[in-house]
Amino acid sequence: MTGKQKLELILSGGVPDTPPHWELVFQIQKEMFGMDRSAVAKEDRPAFDLDVLHRVVDEFGWAAVRGGYDVAEIKRTKDSLGSKALVPAYEGDGVFWMPTGENMVDFAVRLYERMDELQAEARAKCDRAKEFFPQAVDAGADFFVVTYDFGYNDAPFISPEHFGQLVVPYLTEIVETIHDLDRKVILHSDGCIRVLLDQIHATGIDGYQSVDPQGHMDIEQVRRDYPDWILMGNVACNMLQDADEASIRTSVRNCMTHGGVGKRYIFSTSNCIFAGMPPESYRIMLDEYRRIVAECETSSPE
């Protein structure tokens, strides 16, 4: 099976013999391919970005490629790559998530003193997202990734009680809307969200990407607690920054074991292929993944 076929099987409720691989973002095209986006004229960058995505599918076997947050980008990507990779649409503003530094104090004050005001904003956010989803499907989106960072490294951005009031009802609506469009949806969230997972799982969302080791998230425990979930992650990005071969290979084996082989799992980093990652780190990560896949395929009965 191709990576695309494996991912299609997972999204339809099945389990491939070995997990597919893709990443939410790829930002080392210059280091890996010699392709310098900063040297490309603005009007030529959409075509440049598609060329990069073709390279990652052809050379790394990605099962999906970023469709983006914009309907035009989703359509452009689907038209160019839809025959060889799935194209998810991204949405990042449908619910409240971790506020930026300059807004943090104001958000905290409103959370305790003006909850009605926040609820009105939450309603508007959700409604805008629900308008976007059918447009994205019409543009060719095969599934959705909602990018809502709910956690800092040591704790969620709000208490479980406030999360249940301010996020869960709207996230549930978002999931229901996407399911009504016959699409699946995966949550991307960095950080420590252990105390939120029961509430997130109860929304009906289909999967969870990141399972962030820097946020003290244990993929073995998450898999044990939510065996039906599609999990995606969680090779530690801080480890990839350091290019420590033994540590990277150990992290890959942990992901493939517990994520993992024989389960509804997508192999990836705990975030993305970020700018500044040494290309050798990604090569090591892929090499160990491919070695495990080859071992599984060799040992499988005919």
Where are each of the predicted segments found?
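Short, intrinsically disordered low-complexity segments
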Residues: 56-61
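Active-site loop segments of alpha/beta catalytic cores
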Residues: 1-51, 62-302
